């Protein structure tokens, strides 16, 4: 008996020591090579995705004499979440994503988030238009195409919600032209695949926004990166992984990188570092050791879609149709049937289906999640798991899905679909932010967030959606936070040439909305609708008589979707 107790005590002590070692690892900083440049470069960009490349494009125009170096661990640009196959490509503009417009307890629809995202996407259109005019992006149809955005629901409560959402949004210039209908014949004209084979007694409703787009962020990223390399002040290093970040007494940074082709390490000194490495950004932020890094953790979630390439199907679906998550499901489960342009051909994708993975990147390590856990965030991560049990249950359920289960979900949006029509494809990884709140402790936070050190010498972008589609706006925020003096000393004036609406809210003025959209629509070969001075709304298609219902809450309480 005593021997058993002694053995048990020994096991407990060993487990406790192993846990402490795990949470406090590494116990000391390893030695790294000294920087091989006495004069620091101006900026180091980590990660070859759309965020780093967008920031580099801004900086190259604002300060062409600055020396910029970009390090990417893979052998090409935009191979992770920025690649067209690894994201939804929606051009998130809040036209269709119902989780951006929750229903409040009093029955009204909150539209502030939707307006903000719509304005951010207009900034993206301005930025891309500027790059097209200056030859940094190819013909617009290679990366952005007119693709109407739809919201599609069934059931009286959800129809009533969608009606109220439509009424709230169309009072705003950015949403002028959005149509609402409960008429199956009208909805079938908009999206035949949604309606064919559907029972006639099912009550349905949809909104239709002709100004929606499909965006290939991989094309944008690769072409902008190609043009960055035309400058002798820019250097791109592929197959180079950042392994250490150390701040010097003079506030510069030594960035240690490993050449993955020969295994050699070297360090480069930089005045400013941007970590735009997608899912890997959290671990790199932790490598920096800045105090702000202790307030964050991350939870990875992968995504899968059903892919349709048969032209008999793809030629009959030219919209992005977003539904609403089932009651009790997390917002990342919002289903959508999307028309896409990928690899030069039309594709239809349906999903997402969550994929449990401990990787932070699609081409990452299974140990990514575990290596991000430390004594600063371990307890908080456990607390977040306990407080988000619906998400945990959802992921567990998704892990057990069969092809028959996925097809059953598909039939809700494409009633005539056959199992032989589609193949299952794996998209990119996303890492949800877990952040320390001053009052609530660690919480699960949706969206993206810029984390910056107090010296404004290192910045990291954490989070996911809406992400790529609002990258020019996000990087504008970063410029303002990281380089306030340069902004005052001339950058703001230059930015108004790149982003004509800079410093203004597009949605505040029909005249400004028309001016900006007319310009970007012409440059990007996209449809344009003139907003009347008083934002008068166009006549709705046939609408069934309004039913009275008690208020119901939008199933998507958090503002996030894959």
UniProtKB/Swiss-Prot annotation:
<keyword id="KW-0560">Oxidoreductase</keyword>
<dbReference type="InterPro" id="IPR036188">
    <property type="entry name" value="FAD/NAD-bd_sf"/>
</dbReference>
<keyword id="KW-0285">Flavoprotein</keyword>
<dbReference type="GO" id="GO:0047545">
    <property type="term" value="F:2-hydroxyglutarate dehydrogenase activity"/>
</dbReference>
<feature type="compositionally biased region" description="Polar residues">
    <location>
        <begin position="551"/>
        <end position="562"/>
    </location>
</feature>
<protein>
    <recommendedName>
        <fullName>Probable malate:quinone oxidoreductase</fullName>
        <ecNumber>1.1.5.4</ecNumber>
    </recommendedName>
</protein>
<keyword id="KW-0816">Tricarboxylic acid cycle</keyword>
<keyword id="KW-0274">FAD</keyword>
<comment type="similarity">
    <text>Belongs to the MQO family.</text>
</comment>
<feature type="region of interest" description="Disordered">
    <location>
        <begin position="530"/>
        <end position="562"/>
    </location>
</feature>
<comment type="pathway">
    <text>Carbohydrate metabolism; tricarboxylic acid cycle; oxaloacetate from (S)-malate (quinone route): step 1/1.</text>
</comment>
<dbReference type="GO" id="GO:0008924">
    <property type="term" value="F:L-malate dehydrogenase (quinone) activity"/>
</dbReference>
<dbReference type="InterPro" id="IPR006231">
    <property type="entry name" value="MQO"/>
</dbReference>
<dbReference type="GO" id="GO:0006099">
    <property type="term" value="P:tricarboxylic acid cycle"/>
</dbReference>
<dbReference type="Pfam" id="PF06039">
    <property type="entry name" value="Mqo"/>
</dbReference>
